[in-house]
UniProtKB/Swiss-Prot annotation:
The gene is Gstk1. Acetylation of Lys-93 is observed in liver mitochondria from fasted mice but not from fed mice. GO terms for molecular function: glutathione peroxidase activity; glutathione transferase activity. Its main location: mitochondrion. It catalyses: RX + glutathione = an S-substituted glutathione + a halide anion + H(+). Its EC number is 2.5.1.18. It comes from Mus musculus (Mouse). Pfam families: DSBA. This is Glutathione S-transferase kappa 1. It is found in: Mitochondrion. InterPro entries: DSBA-like_thioredoxin_dom, GST_Kappa/NadH, GSTK, HCCAis_GSTk, Thioredoxin-like_sf. It is an enzyme of class 2 (transferase). Glutathione binds at residues 16-18, 53, 183, 200-201.
Length: 226
């Protein structure tokens, strides 16, 4: 019997394109490395407020840089990223609270669907420039991910409950206590120690901490590796 898998907590918000990149890479490696990946829906607005930080898009020069960087990241990570036409306006203004509460509900009620539903919501906002704030938009993403319409509607009815709100706050507070100042934030529990890593470009360092092999953002499949 081999060593127990190391726990990795990924704190993310679908409003963050860099969260999507980190999410996809960790999902690719979860069957290649000896890890147990825990997805934790989080509110980036709460982390920014708690840390006193600003989203990169809100800093003019960083915003200009993002427009140049995203097309390169799309190719490098092989994730279909496209900047929404009005991201700095309506997309940011509307936020992601309904989507993140829905994902929190999924994590509580049907966690095996969390990866797929999270991905479909990212696909809407960060690939197809579609809404993620209206209930029907979230429902469409959940159904596309493979959830039944009835189940998705049931979960939508729960997003305004105090239990779900508290869980999302709990996740956000946990990220802040680890020292998060943005997303994605990955927390690795290795040999009794805890390491907090920020961003989608720290995953090679994560591999080093885990004692695992880094094979780039798009590693071979488990079968190919064997």
């Amino acid at each position: 019997m081999g060593p127990a898998p190391r726990i990795l907590e990924l704190f993310y918000d679908v409003l963050s394109p860099y969260s999507w990149l980190g999410f996809e890479v960790l999902c690719r490696y979860q069957h290649l490395w000896n890890i147990k990946l825990q997805l934790r829906p989080t509110l980036i607005a709460g982390i920014m407020k708690d840390s006193g930080n600003q989203p990169p898009a809100m800093v003019p020069r960083k915003g200009q840089y993002i427009f140049k960087e995203i097309p390169l990241l799309k190719q490098f990570f092989q994730v279909p990223l496209n900047i929404p036409k009005d991201f700095f306006g309506e997309t940011v203004k509307k936020g992601s609270i309904n989507a993140m509460r829905f994902l929190t509900t999924v994590s509580m009620e049907q966690p095996e669907m969390l990866e797929k539903v999270s991905r479909e919501i990212w696909m809407r906002v960060w690939s197809r420039d579609e809404d993620i704030t209206e209930y029907q938009s979230i429902l469409a993403a959940a159904v596309k991910a493979g959830m039944s319409t009835a189940q998705a509607q049931h979960f939508l009815e729960k997003i305004s409950t105090q239990q779900v709100k508290n869980k999302l706050i709990e996740n956000t507070d946990a990220a802040c206590k680890y020292g998060a100042f943005g997303l994605p934030t990955t927390v690795a529990h290795v040999d009794g120690k805890t390491y907090m890593l920020f961003g989608s470009d720290r995953l090679e360092l994560l591999a080093y901490l885990l004692g695992e092999k880094w094979m780039g953002p798009v590693p071979p499949t488990a079968n190919a590796r064997l």
